[in-house]
């Protein structure tokens, strides 16, 4: 049976960790599906990892649809989540809903992911009301890399931390069914996870999120040019064993440890957040 948004809400209620992996092809999707990974994210990171681009901004809808279709063929039980690429939803309402629907109709994805908070809340509401599950993404949002000034930790001070909390509440209220938190301080992610009713999925945001996500190539150590603080290599000899180790460490709370997390907020700042 295909995993569902309802099953992820139940996991949050039972304090059971959700496992997510970013992957881009049929073969890796089959491995992840066989390892009982909850969610396979077809991330726009494929622009850099698969297509050799400098960032995620140039990947197109048609390219994302092709890779999502391949993953959907390989995943029989895992929930397939597709990244909506840059400017596929930030423009008109019509573009947002038509592009989201293409992932469902043409590539057989089960939901879509968008980056941003209050500024895209209306788009989240529109897409979710059409019957398409929407996952939001806050913190380090790669599609906004030019505004953020590079790939760096977000929410390190009181003002920016409160902004992320406000955005998290806004996307939940607009109908987002889940929230990815990327590269925010561990205590901020913990606070957001406790405030929200929807599950949080962390990447570089500590162990208190309701689940974790890593890129398939990164957790297996296949990308020698990239080793972020939040990445752990599990096994590059046998992908099945590597994915199973990742899954088990996420579920048991072993991963991520403090060495894979960022901690910039002191208790005095946390007490001022609401």
From Swiss-Prot:
Alphabetical UniProt keywords: Cytoplasm, Magnesium, Metal-binding, Pantothenate biosynthesis, Transferase
CDD domains referenced in this protein's UniProt entry, alphabetically: KPHMT-like
Cofactor details (free text): Binds 1 Mg(2+) ion per subunit.
Cofactor(s), names only, from the UniProt record: Mg(2+)
Binding site for 3-methyl-2-oxobutanoate: 44-45, 83, 113
Pfam families: Pantoate_transf
Disulfide bridge positions per record: none
GO biological process entries: pantothenate biosynthetic process
Superkingdom: Bacteria
GO molecular function, one term: magnesium ion binding
Pathway: Cofactor biosynthesis; (R)-pantothenate biosynthesis; (R)-pantoate from 3-methyl-2-oxobutanoate: step 1/2
Binding site for Mg(2+): 44, 83, 115
GO cellular component: cytoplasm
InterPro entries: Pantoate_hydroxy_MeTrfase, Pyrv/PenolPyrv_kinase-like_dom, Pyrv_kinase-like_dom_sf
Active site: 182
EC code(s) of this entry: 2.1.2.11
Record's catalysed reaction(s): 3-methyl-2-oxobutanoate + (6R)-5,10-methylene-5,6,7,8-tetrahydrofolate + H2O = 2-dehydropantoate + (6S)-5,6,7,8-tetrahydrofolate
Enzyme class: transferase
Isomerase listed as a keyword: no
Location relative to the cell: Cytoplasm
Sequence similarity: Belongs to the PanB family.
Function per UniProt: Catalyzes the reversible reaction in which hydroxymethyl group from 5,10-methylenetetrahydrofolate is transferred onto alpha-ketoisovalerate to form ketopantoate.
Subunit-structure text: Homodecamer; pentamer of dimers.
Protein name: 3-methyl-2-oxobutanoate hydroxymethyltransferase
Organism: Campylobacter jejuni subsp. doylei (strain ATCC BAA-1458 / RM4099 / 269.97)
């Amino acid at each position: 049976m295909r995993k569902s948004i309802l099953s992820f809400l139940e996991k949050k209620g039972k304090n059971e960790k959700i496992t997510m992996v970013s992957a881009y092809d049929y073969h890796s999707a089959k491995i992840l599906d066989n390892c009982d990974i909850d969610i396979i994210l077809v991330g726009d990171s494929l622009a850099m990892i698969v297509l050799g681009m400098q960032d995620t901004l140039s990947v197109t809808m048609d390219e994302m649809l092709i890779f999502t279709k391949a993953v959907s063929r390989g995943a029989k039980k895992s929930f397939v989540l597709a990244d909506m690429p840059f400017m596929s939803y930030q423009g008109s309402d019509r573009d947002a809903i038509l592009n989201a629907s293409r992932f469902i109709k043409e590539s057989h994805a089960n939901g879509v992911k968008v980056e941003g908070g209050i500024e895209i809340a209306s788009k989240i509401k529109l897409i979710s009301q059409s019957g398409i599950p929407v996952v939001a993404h806050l913190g380090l949002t790669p599609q906004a890399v030019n505004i953020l000034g590079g790939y760096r930790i977000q929410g390190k001070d009181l003002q920016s931390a409160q902004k992320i909390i406000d955005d998290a509440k806004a996307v939940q209220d607009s109908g987002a069914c889940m929230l990815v938190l990327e590269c925010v301080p561990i205590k901020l992610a913990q606070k957001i996870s406790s405030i929200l009713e929807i599950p949080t999925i962390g990447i570089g945001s500590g162990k208190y999120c309701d689940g974790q996500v890593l890129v398939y190539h990164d957790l297996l150590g296949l990308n020698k040019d990239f080793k972020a603080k939040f990445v752990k290599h599990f096994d590059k000899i046998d992908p099945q064993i590597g994915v199973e180790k990742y899954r088990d460490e996420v579920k048991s709370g072993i991963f991520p440890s403090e060495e894979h997390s960022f901690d910039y907020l002191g208790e005095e700042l946390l007490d001022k957040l609401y």
